[in-house]
Amino acid sequence: MRKVKYAGIQMQCTKSVEENIAKADKMVRKAASEGAKIILLPELFERQYFCQERNYDYYLYARSLEDDEAVNHFKKVAAELEVVLPISFYEKDVNVFYNTTAVIDADGSVLGIYRKTHIPDDHYYQEKFYFTPGDTGF
């Protein structure tokens, strides 16, 4: 049986998408240089966690799979480093919003997506305000 090394990355996110992508890029490269072949980044790492309050302006953060900055950036990185990168992003599909993960293969192609099914709803987690339960199964 072949062994596969993976890495889980934790990072503090800022309000700047560009800063967060740059920080994540640096950490992905470090993990890959240490032999990781599957590298997991934090959920919705493109910006600070915004789901703690209800704010209609935050709907503007959502992007399609094809237009998301992190997905497009890390497709190139995955191909360059030959690693698999599950990338979490705030997806807008027509007029429906999802908490989605795109799984990017080691050649830079998107293997598929998973839309989060179980959306928490609590005083500090207003995710049901932002996300529709996913339709991609388990």
Please report, for each region that a protein language model flagged, where it lies by residue.
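Active-site-proximal beta-strand elements of phosphoester/diester hydrolases
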Residues: 3-15, 100, 113-116
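Beta-strand-turn-beta hairpins that frame and shape the catalytic cleft
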Residues: 1-6, 135-138
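Active-site catalytic loop in hydrolytic enzyme cores
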Residues: 63, 76, 92-138
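N-terminal phosphate-binding loop and adjacent alpha-helix
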Residues: 10-27
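A structural motif corresponding to the C-terminal end of an alpha-helix
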Residues: 70-88
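A short acidic, glycine-rich active-site loop
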Residues: 58-72, 129
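Catalytic metal-binding/acid-base residues of hydrolase active sites
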Residues: 12, 45, 90-91
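Active-site beta-strand/loop signature of hydrolases that rely on acidic residues for catalysis
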Residues: 6, 20, 28-57, 78, ...
